[in-house]
Amino acid sequence: MWGPNLGGFSDTQDATAEIQAIADQVKSQLEEKENKKFPVFKAVKFRSQVVAGMNYLIKVQVDEDDFVHIRVFESLPHENKPVALTSYQTNKVRHDELTYF
């Protein structure tokens, strides 16, 4: 069982249904920034970091051999704020390491 480290990112893990749901919440934000649609948007790996909320680094498959790394912030539940895409990197491949950016 993985566990995020306070202040640091967890080890890279296989994406779960929860991580896919988080990625899905920021898909439209990425599509708007990139001015394109992603018919495939499958979370495959992730890392997490506990802060005043949760940061996620998520590797998302957007085509057969094309990946995007997204950084997402999820605020604390009582703040009632939407999940936010805070940064992203395009032109990634499956074997690219998921590191902070």
Curated annotation (Swiss-Prot):
The modification N-acetylmethionine is found at M1. GO terms for molecular function: cysteine-type endopeptidase inhibitor activity. Gene3D superfamilies: 3.10.450.10. Strong inhibitor of papain and cathepsin L but poor inhibitor of cathepsin B. Pfam families: Cystatin (PF00031). This is Stefin-C. Keywords: Acetylation, Cytoplasm, Protease inhibitor, Thiol protease inhibitor. Its main location: cytoplasm. Belongs to the cystatin family. The record marks G7 as: Reactive site. One of its GO terms (cellular component) is cytosol. A motif (Secondary area of contact) lies at residues 49-53. It is found in: Cytoplasm. InterPro entries: Cystatin_dom, Cystatin_sf, Prot_inh_cystat_CS, Prot_inh_stefin.
